[in-house]
Design a protein with these regions (language model features):
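Interaction-mediating elements
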Residues: 1-60, 64-192
Length: 192
């Protein structure tokens, strides 16, 4: 396992978990991926890392299956490949899959994992980037705090960019009822 993967794992949320196995996925024409199978008590997760230590995804391993079939290379259309090369120069393609009629492409760009989604006719729909709360603009945080979800705990934050707008999707959970919601706020602080 490369030092960058080990360092990223040891600095991440799963550092205290036991590493049960490490798989190296070599795929023609796509990024090499390392899969760390980690466990704690009855929970198991597969953590997918790029060679340079970017955490690509965290997947609960409910069946103990380690075939990683969802990481098999998918052929991308020229339109999608050209768009990615133009909008994200130097991006490395990690994975691509068809889901609900859309094509979702996972890339690494500027040291971050991004998911780029294309719809009918390979039109770009949006790009999603996971971000830390500290990276969210103050105006967006203030909007969340003044909303009905202001006292709820924050589970996850994603930044979305589409052809016509940029917004944050903030997953929150009520500490009393454990109800969950996703709050969408434009980059200027407008609640959607």
């Amino acid at each position: 396992m490369p030092r960058a993967v080990r360092t990223a794992y040891e600095a991440g949320d799963y550092a205290a978990w036991h590493v049960d196995d490490v798989d190296k996925l070599l795929r023609n024409g796509q990024e090499t991926v390392y899969v760390l199978e980690v466990e704690r008590a009855e929970q198991e997760f597969d953590l997918y890392y790029s060679e340079d230590g970017v955490l690509l995804r965290e997947v609960p391993d409910r069946d103990g299956n380690d075939d990683h079939g969802d990481m098999l290379p998918q052929e991308l259309s020229k339109a999608i490949s050209d768009f990615i090369a133009r909008k994200y120069p130097g991006a490395r393609i990690v994975d691509a899959e068809r889901e609900k009629g859309n094509t979702e492409v996972d890339i690494i760009f500027a040291g971050k994992a991004l998911e780029v989604c294309f719809g009918t006719g390979d039109a770009w729909l949006w790009t999603k980037t996971g971000v830390r709360l500290s990276e969210v603009p103050d105006v967006v945080r203030r909007t969340l705090q003044s909303s009905q979800y202001g006292t709820w705990g924050i589970d996850d934050v994603d930044l979305y960019e589409s052809p016509d707008r940029v917004w944050y999707a903030i997953e929150v959970e009520d500490p009393q009822s454990e109800r969950e919601a996703t709050v969408r706020i434009l980059e200027d602080g407008t609640l959607l």
